[in-house]
Amino acid sequence: MSATSPITQDVVTFPRKLPEGGKRNLVGLTRPELAEALAAAGTPEKQVKMRVNQIWQWLYERGVRDFNDMTNLAKPYRALLADQFEIAVPEVVSRHVSEDGTRKYLVRIAGGHEVEVVYIPEEDRGTLCVSSQVGCTLTCSFCHTGTQKLVRNLTAGEIVGQIMIARDDLGEWPLPGRNPKNETRLLSNIVLMGMGEPLYNFEAVRDAMKIAMDPEGISLSRRRITLSTSGVVPEIARTAEEIGCMLAVSFHATTDEVRDKLVPINKRWNIATLLDALRDYPKASNSERITFEYVMLKGVNDSDEDARRLVELIKGIPAKINLIPFNEWPGAPYERSSNNRIRAFADIIYKAGYASPIRTPRGEDIMAACGQLKSATERARKSRAQIAAETGLG
């Protein structure tokens, strides 16, 4: 199958229709979409551009959720907006804080579906791990999240809404007499490494990230946004052209035989095809390098030979290799490589001239670590459902 073949998923998802008589959500609309919506609502043509700028700043620079708080708009115009539109973000169902400061939010979106969002504080940055789909279609054998079937894609509003609720919790919207732009940002980076494959939901992810990068709003540099893909080859060049963010690749193996088992998408776009697509990305996107993510699995992909083969495979690609200790989960078919084995693997890569940081697991005590998202929640709810069925209370 060629690298330009149409992309398909196990589950076909369709955009959700607006309920009869429902209001359109302004969160997630691009500037052109917002202009079109305001014009259709009766905004005079000569005022549309000005109104877009005003509303955009209220939504994404100040975090306002009530049209009545948009004080530089006339009251009749605020009433018109409130009559036809809403400002809606995902509902926070639960919030857990790890011993290491990691925060995990379970959020509910349209249709009653739930996804998880993780905030990871560090000394020099604060990173938000964002989801792009409900469930996942990739079935990577080492990832617990991948055992959960794909339900649907998230909308651009549901994706950017995750950023907004995290800023709510962190208190990072302006208050009278305070300008957060003059302060160290608590939420400074975004990684599209939550539930789902971002490149299987390209348009919504692109629009959400464009909103996050807009200098008149959330204003995050594209260098502070990293999109992680398992290797959807046909969309990689498009990502460079239309988003231009940093790119991470879930690589995890140095032979097709092993990667076919760990990351089944490799059966469609193998290692050679993937690497060919990646070689042009740093130049096309004006990004410094590509991050190769490599989960360390005992006796599977952690030998010295694997390390040397990895270095040979990526030769010529500006890159760093993130080594990820496997986050074990009940029933997992793999074990974490020993610390000594991981360090030896990292040393081979480092001596070949590549940065090879070993990721420190974060949020394990609240099931917020890599590959664990939503798993504990689903297990708990399944258990409650089983109990209810057994007792006749379901």
Curated annotation (Swiss-Prot):
<protein>
    <recommendedName>
        <fullName>Dual-specificity RNA methyltransferase RlmN</fullName>
        <ecNumber>2.1.1.192</ecNumber>
    </recommendedName>
</protein>
<feature type="disulfide bond" description="(transient)">
    <location>
        <begin position="129"/>
        <end position="370"/>
    </location>
</feature>
<keyword id="KW-0949">S-adenosyl-L-methionine</keyword>
<comment type="similarity">
    <text>Belongs to the radical SAM superfamily. RlmN family.</text>
</comment>
<dbReference type="GO" id="GO:0005737">
    <property type="term" value="C:cytoplasm"/>
</dbReference>
<dbReference type="InterPro" id="IPR013785">
    <property type="entry name" value="Aldolase_TIM"/>
</dbReference>
<dbReference type="GO" id="GO:0070040">
    <property type="term" value="F:rRNA (adenine(2503)-C2-)-methyltransferase activity"/>
</dbReference>
<feature type="binding site">
    <location>
        <position position="140"/>
    </location>
    <ligand>
        <name>[4Fe-4S] cluster</name>
    </ligand>
</feature>
<dbReference type="GO" id="GO:0051539">
    <property type="term" value="F:4 iron, 4 sulfur cluster binding"/>
</dbReference>
<feature type="binding site">
    <location>
        <begin position="250"/>
        <end position="252"/>
    </location>
    <ligand>
        <name>S-adenosyl-L-methionine</name>
    </ligand>
</feature>
<keyword id="KW-0819">tRNA processing</keyword>
<keyword id="KW-0479">Metal-binding</keyword>
<feature type="binding site">
    <location>
        <position position="136"/>
    </location>
    <ligand>
        <name>[4Fe-4S] cluster</name>
    </ligand>
</feature>
<dbReference type="InterPro" id="IPR040072">
    <property type="entry name" value="Methyltransferase_A"/>
</dbReference>
<feature type="domain" description="Radical SAM core">
    <location>
        <begin position="122"/>
        <end position="365"/>
    </location>
</feature>
<dbReference type="GO" id="GO:0030488">
    <property type="term" value="P:tRNA methylation"/>
</dbReference>
<dbReference type="InterPro" id="IPR007197">
    <property type="entry name" value="rSAM"/>
</dbReference>
<dbReference type="Pfam" id="PF21016">
    <property type="entry name" value="RlmN_N"/>
</dbReference>
<feature type="binding site">
    <location>
        <position position="143"/>
    </location>
    <ligand>
        <name>[4Fe-4S] cluster</name>
    </ligand>
</feature>
<keyword id="KW-0489">Methyltransferase</keyword>
<feature type="active site" description="Proton acceptor">
    <location>
        <position position="116"/>
    </location>
</feature>
<keyword id="KW-0411">Iron-sulfur</keyword>
<dbReference type="GO" id="GO:0046872">
    <property type="term" value="F:metal ion binding"/>
</dbReference>
<keyword id="KW-0408">Iron</keyword>
<dbReference type="InterPro" id="IPR004383">
    <property type="entry name" value="rRNA_lsu_MTrfase_RlmN/Cfr"/>
</dbReference>
<keyword id="KW-0004">4Fe-4S</keyword>
<keyword id="KW-0698">rRNA processing</keyword>
<dbReference type="GO" id="GO:0070475">
    <property type="term" value="P:rRNA base methylation"/>
</dbReference>
<comment type="function">
    <text>Specifically methylates position 2 of adenine 2503 in 23S rRNA and position 2 of adenine 37 in tRNAs. m2A2503 modification seems to play a crucial role in the proofreading step occurring at the peptidyl transferase center and thus would serve to optimize ribosomal fidelity.</text>
</comment>
<dbReference type="GO" id="GO:0000049">
    <property type="term" value="F:tRNA binding"/>
</dbReference>
<feature type="binding site">
    <location>
        <begin position="196"/>
        <end position="197"/>
    </location>
    <ligand>
        <name>S-adenosyl-L-methionine</name>
    </ligand>
</feature>
<feature type="binding site">
    <location>
        <position position="228"/>
    </location>
    <ligand>
        <name>S-adenosyl-L-methionine</name>
    </ligand>
</feature>
<keyword id="KW-0808">Transferase</keyword>
<dbReference type="InterPro" id="IPR027492">
    <property type="entry name" value="RNA_MTrfase_RlmN"/>
</dbReference>
<dbReference type="InterPro" id="IPR048641">
    <property type="entry name" value="RlmN_N"/>
</dbReference>
<keyword id="KW-0963">Cytoplasm</keyword>
<feature type="active site" description="S-methylcysteine intermediate">
    <location>
        <position position="370"/>
    </location>
</feature>
<dbReference type="GO" id="GO:0002935">
    <property type="term" value="F:tRNA (adenine(37)-C2)-methyltransferase activity"/>
</dbReference>
<dbReference type="Pfam" id="PF04055">
    <property type="entry name" value="Radical_SAM"/>
</dbReference>
<keyword id="KW-1015">Disulfide bond</keyword>
<dbReference type="GO" id="GO:0019843">
    <property type="term" value="F:rRNA binding"/>
</dbReference>
<feature type="binding site">
    <location>
        <position position="327"/>
    </location>
    <ligand>
        <name>S-adenosyl-L-methionine</name>
    </ligand>
</feature>
